[in-house]
Amino acid sequence: MSLSEEQVRSFLDGNPTFAHQYFGKKLSPENVAGACEDGWLADCGSLRELCQVEESAALFELVQDMQESVNMERVVFKILRRLCTILHADRCSLFMYRQRNGIAELATRLFSVQPDSLLEDCLVPPDSEIVFPLDIGIVGHVAQTKKMINVQDVAECPHFSSFADELTDYVTKNILSTPIMNGKDVVAVIMAVNKLDGPCFTSEDEDVFTKYLNFATLNLKIYHLSYLHNCETRRGQVLLWSANKVFEELTDIERQFHKAFYTVRAYLNCERYSVGLLDMTKEKEFFDVWPVLMGEAQPYSGPRTPDGREIVFYKVIDYILHGKEDIKVIPTPPADHWALASGLPTYVAESGFICNIMNASADEMFNFQEGPLDDSGWVIKNVLSMPIVNKKEEIVGVATFYNRKDGKPFDDQDEVLMESLTQFLGWSVLNTDTYDKMNKLENRKDIAQDMVLYHVRCDKDEIQEILPTRDRLGKEPADCEEDELGKILKEELPGPTKFDIYEFHFSDLECTELELVKCGIQMYYELGVVRKFQIPQEVLVRFLFSVSKAYRRITYHNWRHGFNVAQTMFTLLMTGKLKSYYTDLEAFAMVTAGLCHDIDHRGTNNLYQMKSQNPLAKLHGSSILERHHLEFGKFLLAEESLNIYQNLNRRQHEHVIHLMDIAIIATDLALYFKKRTMFQKIVDESKNYEDKKSWVEYLSLETTRKEIVMAMMMTACDLSAITKPWEVQSKVALLVAAEFWEQGDLERTVLDQQPIPMMDRNKAAELPKLQVGFIDFVCTFVYKEFSRFHEEILPMFDRLQNNRKEWKALADEYEAKVKALEEEKKKEEDRVAAKKVGTEVCNGGPAPKSSTCCIL
């Protein structure tokens, strides 16, 4: 049946799409040229040029759109619409590549684009996306293989999925699809569906497809790189600001998390987020366990963290960013609280997994509230939840983010950003844990110091042994005037002559420990510092008594040794005339340093502290015990009731503490050999001054030289037992040796090491020889130089020489005995050998050979 011209015209007017497609195909330059007469070739060529101009204009328009528009969807939409026309495809679609929970997928961004479509109709909103995992559908296969695919008949393609057709009531016949790549990474997949003017897409269509997709690829690359740049910028800002708040708040994990999360809220790109903090208790208290053991309560059967803790959220912090910003803190949240009711935070705390949920209301595993949470009408759409893990790989909390601001589900870049934040905050827990440990250690230290002070400090009854104010005045020392205390002390103290505290030959052997305390108090009065520096007399008594108690009850380095060193310092200053170089304040500090120089000594040396890995060795790098003695002395002086420096001004106090630092550290014999040459130069320098007064004036102003002399004085005081009269020195030497042998026993039993001869009890007989070596190698230089420096100190050097003679005589006597024993031993060995030979001859054994004859 033929159609009239009017009917054809009417049909074409009523079907513009068909007309456009039909004439677009029939009126190509080639077809028109073939239908034209020869005379029209020039005009037909002009028609071809006109089509090329139109094509160039279209390409120019695309380039212009790419340059002017930052909207990726708009540019790609125009490209797809143009492709539909050129390829004669029924429709085109754009699928964006993304990852969630570590699984790649493709989601529709532009769907069913036709030549006359509008962007608004084709742009897929986030809640209407069609999502293809990479193992489903042809687009998934394209993303996996990263190659263009031309499917001529989908019925014969094993990768085809009718999932989208069923959703849209559409029938797909053939497909041309290609990936958009950024290097080796897939960015998107573009697909053309159903060839209109043929059974399938041809190779020419593939070429055209590729040509136009160069523009799409460029645009999508720019979009992808821009998105990655934006994500990295946000990530950098998140880490920067969270670090700022983490290091600003080191004391409390809750405050640290809150400050960090609140500060970075603008960079998280979500409408709301909550942080659930987990109880870190691993073991229950006994009173919580008893009801379970008694059958009165059911044992916990709920989920646990990977390290075995019960999952208990003790606090939830809810950050609301949509509408009016708000923060809600929920201590001890109930199980049905909206942030916990879904079960997602509990699951994350149990498994440690990152969970990215695209459609919360349709999720079958977790029970999210479908309706609005509050009066604002806010609804949960998509969720990203992840654990906050500390450096010990313990889950300390769970952070959950709701509803990405642009409506799209959270992608892999969001996961990376949020994970960076939670990971950083998890590691920063180490700061608060360390602070908490330090705080506890500080508290324990304070408690330990208080306990030590309780046992060391002179109590109210002990002070009455020196200051009997109850018997004399009927009241406590604190209630007495200074003059009253001074009168009592004047009567109770022994005076300077009773125990010869001004003499180098002073011996403590005839004194009780309490008498030594009284002698120590007397030395301060003799120095004239009590009145000058306004030392409270009760404080002075308490200080000396407490120092005596702070020395341990060990063999040698006890209170008696501490007092002897202070007395020798006092004698060097007063009798040895070294006080002329020092002020009263400096003499005050030097005697105090002598009293404290070995306080709390353990009876073992520095080397043993290191070998036994004593905490002191870890606390102090060098001069281990000396630094401990110094710290202990300062600790006592820090107590107001013992602080004899309490009335010094700031500059005076700093000066005496500085001198104590030098004086006590100088008792380390390892430092003695470093300062010997410097001290000798000072002594030699003093001999260049004929006028002693000029030398005193010079040295008094030379701070460094005075400190070197003081340091050498401390060494002379520490070794002064070697300069006592022989009857005293011989006894003290045995005490020193006994303490050394005790350390040797510890090295042998505890450290399983062989001690050096000086500390070996089995070589006790070699003590005289060791003493001679010690005098020659260490002691002689000190006292020889001091006797050159001040002739008043010569008695110390003379007694040292005398003691050396005594030890040398004992050493020679021991050597003679050893030699005699060796000779006797050799004779005995010779007798045994001769007897053995005679026995062999009598028994018919071989006779000795003669050098002059031979017996046949």
Curated annotation (Swiss-Prot):
Reactions this protein catalyses: 3',5'-cyclic GMP + H2O = GMP + H(+)
Propiece residue ranges: 854-856
Catalytic residue positions: 557
PDEase domain: residues covered: 481-814
Gene3D superfamilies: 3'5'-cyclic nucleotide phosphodiesterase, catalytic domain (1.10.1300.10), 3.30.450.40
Every GAF domain range: 71-220, 252-429
Keywords annotated in UniProt: Acetylation, Cell projection, cGMP, Hydrolase, Lipoprotein, Magnesium, Manganese, Membrane, Metal-binding, Prenylation, Repeat, Sensory transduction, Vision, Zinc
Record-level GO cellular component terms: photoreceptor outer segment; plasma membrane
Localization: Membrane; Cell projection, Cilium, Photoreceptor outer segment
Lipidation (S-geranylgeranyl cysteine): 853
UniProt-listed Enzyme Commission number(s): 3.1.4.35
Functional summary from the UniProt entry: Rod-specific cGMP phosphodiesterase that catalyzes the hydrolysis of 3',5'-cyclic GMP. Necessary for the formation of a functional phosphodiesterase holoenzyme. Involved in retinal circadian rhythm photoentrainment via modulation of UVA and orange light-induced phase-shift of the retina clock. May participate in processes of transmission and amplification of the visual signal.
Oligomeric and partner information: Oligomer composed of two catalytic chains (alpha and beta), an inhibitory chain (gamma) and the delta chain.
Protein name, UniProt field: Rod cGMP-specific 3',5'-cyclic phosphodiesterase subunit beta
